Amino acid sequence: MMQSFIRGTSSRAVMEHEMQDLMDQDPPSFGVRKLCQKGWSIAEIDGSILNHDTHGFDSFISALAHHDQELMDELRKTLIGRGIQVPTMNGNQKFINLDNSASTRTFTPIWNTFRQTLPQSEPVKQEIIQEVKTICSDFLNAPLADYEVIFTSNTTEAINLAAENLSLESDNTIEPVVLNTLLEHSSNDLPWRMIPGCSVVRLSIDGEGFVDSNEMEGILKAYNQEGQFGKKRIRIVAVSGASNVLGVCNNLKEISRIAHCHGARLLVDGAQLVAHRKVALDDCGIDYFAFSAHKVYAPFGSGALVVKKDQLHFTPEEMEQIQISGEENAAGIAALGKALLLLKRIGMDRIEAEEQVLTRKVLTEMAQIPGLDIYGIKDPDSNRFSDKIGVIPFEIKNKIATQVGKELALIGGIGVRSGCHCAHITVKHILHVGPGLEKFQKLIVTLFPKLSLPGVVRISLGIENSEADIDRLILALGSITDKQNKSSKKEAKRLMNKFVDAMAEQIYQTV
């Protein structure tokens, strides 16, 4: 049945049939030789577990260029947890998730793929893992002839592997340096600090979060060409593909050009990038690319390091231990493969375009709320707006970030993230928290543990979000900034306890 989908037929009837087949929520029955017949492509053990015929697929997309929106709409209907009600000060309301940067929820086809993989035999699981490597390679434009795909548990483990790989370089004539930025998540900061004898230098960022390519070139030249710092040489430039705090996407192609021009390699923390933008490792000249499945609608404990083969310093025995030590998370890897296939079928250009519309709406309407300050790119008409994903950090005057997060939940049933977002360096920078103030804050928190350190509130969009979600957000923010509106903490606690008791009872009854 899926052959017509792969060949690229433009028949409207067939398209609707295949779309339903793709989204079917009923678990298929499968025998000894089949993984699934619905929701995935080809499932013969002796054939292709996950058909990734990109030529046929591209033909299909081309023929149905005006229907990718329908596929996205159908996918949204299968969101796990869609329509769940949560208690608020205004009664039960549908939960709105605006915390996609922390972790994305999943969809039924991806969930089905995960659970259908669990009972499979080891040979089938190994076939699936190899197929998903090809899917990752295709999705990221990282040819398997040149790149190795190493599955991990998350981005942090992937970057730890890259850091360990750097530590294996045997050149006693230099002291390795990693060039980082002020934008980095702890996953792309702490691993580099753990390398013996390695130091970290950070690039500054401007008011919107962008690095200065001239500063970068100057630092690389000073270290690698002029030898101004003795034996220290920058070996890796490690940057985020998209900031998890400010949402900005720096020019990876330009960063790669400068890095390679001065004898350094480029590692990209792609955790926040993969679900939002088209990525081309080969075209950009990226040497290492790390990402997590839970940021890309497959929250089942997998991730990957995609690395140029000529950059690996592990022995064949060490590589084998890395890849197959213990039992691999085949089901999580399969879910990742399914998620990437779905994103490609929808089209990353479509996903980016929709997200830009919502981001523009958020920025425009939040700018009208008194006492609310947005960090990073604020103006949707800025010429750099196109370099921003749907991540918007903000604060409300005279309110602690964690309190704003709680009030959004209580008033609107909206889930956001507040605090430092595992990017303390970035948040301290944008809030202008100097060393003296930081020490004072730590002392205060030690004396009064219930107090929260300064942070920002973060809204982060995903493909599940709609303009209606933004409307509810703006309404709730308006209510929070209205000084006349005072919610009762006692009533909020009562509602929450009632909700928890009801959910617990429901779970026990189900069991």
List the predicted regions and their residue ranges:
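Pyridoxal 5′-phosphate
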Residues: 2-511
